[in-house]
Amino acid sequence: MSRSTSSDRRITRRKAILKQAKGFRGRRGTNFKAARDAVRKALLHSYVGRKDKKSDMRQIWITRINAAVRAEGITYSRFIAGMNKAGIQLNRKALSNMAIEDPTAFKAVVEASKKALGV
């Protein structure tokens, strides 16, 4: 019986890792062991980054809304409280886009929020 080796599978696996490490600097892009560790860490960072992106985007939306409502003479927290009282259900992404793309509609929402607060 002939002796079997894992050479084909091993070469394929190593090529795949080195392909993923293409563009990495120094030994991390050419040496298999270093590349394997670098690729693992890079994949972990990309996974975590996809989760963090959601929080970052929400923070950007809130900052944009805050800037837009302060121009109308009200703070962000009072604006959100007024929206809840008025029964306006718009998410922060929609409000942020509205503040940028349709300022007149956003101003109407701010006025409705102010009216609900009695300001």
UniProtKB/Swiss-Prot annotation:
GO CC: one term? ribosome
Q: Name one Pfam family in it.
A: Ribosomal_L20
The role this protein plays is: Binds directly to 23S ribosomal RNA and is necessary for the in vitro assembly process of the 50S ribosomal subunit. It is not involved in the protein synthesizing functions of that subunit.
Q: Which SUPFAM superfamilies match?
A: Ribosomal protein L20
* Gene expressing this chain: rplT
Keyword Nucleus assigned to the entry: answer is: no
Ordered alphabetically, the record's keywords are: Ribonucleoprotein, Ribosomal protein, RNA-binding, rRNA-binding
Q: Which PANTHER family match?
A: 39S RIBOSOMAL PROTEIN L20 (PTHR10986)
User: Biological process (GO) annotations?
Assistant: ribosomal large subunit assembly; translation
Provide a Gene Ontology MF annotation, just one. Answer: structural constituent of ribosome
InterPro entries referenced in this protein's UniProt entry, alphabetically: Ribosomal_bL20, RIBOSOMAL_L20_CS, Ribosomal_protein_bL20_C
Protein name in UniProt: Large ribosomal subunit protein bL20
The cross-references to NCBIfam families, in alphabetical order and at most eight, read:
rplT_bact
Keyword Ribonucleoprotein assigned to the entry: answer is yes
By sequence similarity, the record places it as follows:
Belongs to the bacterial ribosomal protein bL20 family.
